[in-house]
Amino acid sequence: GIFISAEGIALGHALSLTSQQIWLLCALCAGLLLALAIRWLLTPPAALVRASHVETSLPASGSDTRRAAWRLLMVYGLAGFGYIITATYLPLFLSGSLQSVDPVHLWALFGLAAAPSCLIWHKLVLKWGYRQALTRNLLFQALGVILPACSASLLFCVLSALLVGFTFMGTVTIALPKAKSLSHQVSFNMIAAMTALYGVGQIAGPLITGALYQIAASFNPALCAAALALLIAAGLVFTERQA
């Protein structure tokens, strides 16, 4: 979806379409994808039906797992803040510095990297385990976030798009099953709380970026803050006691 929308916008720019016409083009693409999704929901593949009936075992109760639940909430909120600045402002990092390349193509790379990421990170969780997989995911994400602050070159921005695109959905893939396994340890809906905190991070990111940009006239302070948030999240995961 990210890839299609980005390339649709780039096509609109190349054809000198107005913003209203580009919005209509994006709406057409969304409508086609919605039709496919509705058809899939009405006749789900047999594999999805079987998977929906698979029961998962609950871990043993105790103070350690309760602490793990609260720690995961903090990690997820920090992750929401950490990725959103790059995801929001990525094309602007190259805006005005390229003559013949539309910066919106960076969004296409972001989407291409995200497309297979959930499947890959799921396999990596099975191989490495939750703690190592999420720690590495957040560290790679932090690296991708900080790269444009080191250099606004095309290479660094492309690497940033690929790294953040490949890892941000991986964070969700790794964290939500863990949240489900810990949900019985808290008195509220764990998945809902995680989604809310992730959203708070997503809202706070652009607001803080705007404030810092007014002070420094640069995205670098916000990128450093986002990378720091991801490093703190990685540290919280890495130092968690293993059951």
Language model segments and positions:
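Helix-loop-helix hairpin linking two adjacent transmembrane segments in secondary transporters
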Residues: G1-L42
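A membrane-interface helix-boundary motif in multi-pass transporters
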Residues: H13-C29, G210-L230
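Multi-pass alpha-helical transporter architecture, strongest
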Residues: L33-L42, C224-A243
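Extracytoplasmic gate region of multi-pass secondary transporters
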Residues: R67-A108, A115-P116
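Helix-to-loop junctions at the C-terminal end of transmembrane segments
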Residues: S117-Y130, Y213-Q214
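Structural signature of the two symmetry-related core transmembrane helices
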Residues: Q132-L147
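Intracellular juxtamembrane helix-capping segments at the cytosolic ends
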Residues: M169-S183
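A late C-terminal transmembrane helix in Major Facilitator Superfamily
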Residues: L182-S218, A226
